[in-house]
Amino acid sequence: MIGKLKGLIDSYGEDYVILDVHGVGYQVHCSSRTLQALPSPGEAATLSIETYVREDQIKLFGFRTDHEREWFRLLQTVQSVGAKVALAVLSTLPPNDLANAIALRDKAAVARTPGVGPKVAERIVSELKDKVPALSNVDPAVVQLSGALDDNRAPRPVTDAISALVNLGYGQPQAAAAIAAAARAAGDDAATAQLIKLGLKELSK
């Protein structure tokens, strides 16, 4: 099985790259985020590879990091999620944002993925919520905030600050993670304006 490929970028397709490894061109399917991050044709690149072997074909999927590949595998443990949907999810949400979305039970963020409806998004969140801590360094403050939001126990300044960041164009998982970190740093009595300021500082790191 192929686990990693290192070579020169030959060309790009809609959802794949041709990687020239010592004169052999490998067609490797990637998320749109991975494709956008790869260099121009003729330049060197390294991809972690997941190899799928079927009766009628061998298909390669490529990732910039082993971590992204682990998420690709994990997503496919969810009912109705195959390789195509898993790549689409990773095209919409990078691993850290996906982890935060799942920790925050943010089905809407996952459902923004083309081809993923509310039911599949709900399955992804519900089936993976207990597996996220083992795979990602999710801030414990995010997990705590998730429970508070679920039970409507989150302080008003916190919810207002999250809404403000979302209105500024940040995704819900990003905004919630930033405000969770801000609230942890500022304390329980922090005002909305202070949380927004600290949250923006977190997002700029």
UniProtKB/Swiss-Prot annotation:
Name of the gene encoding the protein in the UniProt record: ruvA
Span list, region Domain II: 65-143
The protein's role, per its UniProt record: The RuvA-RuvB-RuvC complex processes Holliday junction (HJ) DNA during genetic recombination and DNA repair, while the RuvA-RuvB complex plays an important role in the rescue of blocked DNA replication forks via replication fork reversal (RFR). RuvA specifically binds to HJ cruciform DNA, conferring on it an open structure. The RuvB hexamer acts as an ATP-dependent pump, pulling dsDNA into and through the RuvAB complex. HJ branch migration allows RuvC to scan DNA until it finds its consensus sequence, where it cleaves and resolves the cruciform DNA.
Stretches for region Domain III: 154-205
Superkingdom of origin organism: Bacteria
Molecular function via GO: ATP binding; four-way junction DNA binding; four-way junction helicase activity
Subunit annotation: Homotetramer. Forms an RuvA(8)-RuvB(12)-Holliday junction (HJ) complex. HJ DNA is sandwiched between 2 RuvA tetramers; dsDNA enters through RuvA and exits via RuvB. An RuvB hexamer assembles on each DNA strand where it exits the tetramer. Each RuvB hexamer is contacted by two RuvA subunits (via domain III) on 2 adjacent RuvB subunits; this complex drives branch migration. In the full resolvosome a probable DNA-RuvA(4)-RuvB(12)-RuvC(2) complex forms which resolves the HJ.
Record's protein name: Holliday junction branch migration complex subunit RuvA
Organism of derivation: Rhodopseudomonas palustris (strain BisB5)
Region of interest (Flexible linker), residue spans: 144-154
